[in-house]
Amino acid sequence: MKLILTAEVDHLGEPGDTVEVKDGYGRNYLLPRGLAIVASRGAQRQADDIRRARELKTVKGLEHANEIKTALEALDTVELAVNASADTGKLFGSVTATDVVAAIKKAGGPNLDKRTVALPKAHIKSLGTHSVSVRLHPGVEASVSLNVVAES
């Protein structure tokens, strides 16, 4: 059975792709859930529109990611004040991706999603300067220097 996908399906394809599947899989799973439509001339035109929209969205997303990367690289060092032991310099708790996003926003940087921030380890648990990477788009990654200091 020849179908055109209207949504992303794992191990099969993305919206707008024309795929060949077994009849039962198409009739019992893809078509009832609205994940695909039967391939025809009109449906092929619709698939071309979906594909063009997806490509345009990818290009716009890449341009936006590059703008955010430029804004992040313009920041020298982002400073984050946290509760820490005066003797050992160890933190009471840890610095998470949410804390990093708030510090970047406070330093005048762009508003980011916490899921884009990749910490060197799961959490930062010591004072000092740490390099944090931000994944903005597939292929576009920015690096931010984060200086963790003790609150006074």
Swiss-Prot record:
Disulfide bonds: none
One GO BP: translation
Keyword Transmembrane helix recorded: no
Pfam families referenced in this protein's UniProt entry, alphabetically: Ribosomal_L9_C, Ribosomal_L9_N
Domain of life: Bacteria
Any single GO CC term annotated in Swiss-Prot or TrEMBL for this entry: ribonucleoprotein complex
Keywords linked to the UniProt accession: Ribonucleoprotein, Ribosomal protein, RNA-binding, rRNA-binding
InterPro entries recorded: Ribosomal_bL9 (IPR000244), Ribosomal_bL9/RNase_H1_N (IPR009027), Ribosomal_bL9_bac/chp (IPR020594), Ribosomal_bL9_C (IPR020069), Ribosomal_bL9_C_sf (IPR036791), Ribosomal_bL9_N (IPR020070), Ribosomal_bL9_N_sf (IPR036935)
Any one GO MF annotation of this record: structural constituent of ribosome
Family statement drawn from the similarity comment of this UniProt entry: Belongs to the bacterial ribosomal protein bL9 family.
NCBIfam families cross-referenced by the UniProt entry: L9
Its job: Binds to the 23S rRNA.
Protein name in the entry: Large ribosomal subunit protein bL9
Source species of the chain: Mycobacterium sp. (strain KMS)
Gene assigned in the entry: rplI
